[in-house]
């Protein structure tokens, strides 16, 4: 979900650590996707890739939650023309995968069928199947939302 619910100090720690990781790997220009876990306020990078984010992070979530043209920036970076600018959040976006682990979110999936905040819905039926990988969760369907706040069972 974007934006992440993080304190300003934690967000800054992540920015500094991510910059340090990219510099250490020699990634100076272009796309980069970093995944991290925060455990007991410690940062653990679990994936770093010189590519855009998957699971609709780049093509849908970032484009809809910020005033940042992700694809223009990617092209400009590849051509050596990218100029840094501040990015502002303009909405909340998120993706919920329709799998057994998310069966408690059934009210969200039901409401998404007719809600204006649902910008993509690939859920085919009400069966919540077990998912052991991204492929299985994508195959079982998902919804993507864009709204003034994070969509939860409590605010639909």
Regions found by a protein language model. Give the residues of each.
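Short coil/turn motifs at secondary-structure junctions
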Residues: 41, 53-55, 148
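Short, structured loop/turn "capping" segments at alpha-beta junctions
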Residues: 28-30, 69, 83-88
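C-terminal catalytic subdomain
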Residues: 62-75
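Peripheral (often C-terminal) accessory segments that flank ATP-dependent C-N-forming ligase machineries
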Residues: 75-156
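Pre-DFG segment of protein kinase catalytic domains
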Residues: 45-47
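Glycine-rich beta-alpha junction loops
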Residues: 4, 38, 49-52, 99-102
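Internal nucleotide-binding/catalytic subdomain
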Residues: 1-43
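Glycine-rich phosphate/pyrophosphate-binding beta-alpha loops
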Residues: 49-65, 123-129
């Amino acid at each position: 979900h974007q934006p992440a619910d993080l304190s300003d100090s934690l967000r800054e720690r992540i920015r500094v650590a991510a910059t340090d990781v990219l510099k250490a790997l020699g990634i100076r220009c272009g796309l980069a996707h970093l995944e991290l876990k925060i455990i007991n306020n410690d940062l653990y990078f679990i994936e770093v890739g010189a590519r855009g984010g998957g699971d609709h992070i780049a093509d849908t979530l970032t484009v809809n939650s910020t005033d940042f043209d992700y694809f223009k920036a990617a092209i400009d970076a590849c051509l050596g023309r990218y100029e840094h600018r501040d990015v502002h959040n303009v909405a909340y976006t998120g993706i919920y995968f329709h799998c057994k682990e998310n069966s408690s979110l059934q009210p969200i999936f039901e409401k998404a069928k007719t809600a204006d905040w649902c910008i993509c819905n690939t859920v085919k039926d009400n069966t919540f199947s077990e998912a052991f990988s991204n492929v299985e969760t994508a195959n079982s369907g998902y919804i993507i939302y864009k709204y003034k706040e994070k969509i939860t069972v409590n605010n639909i």
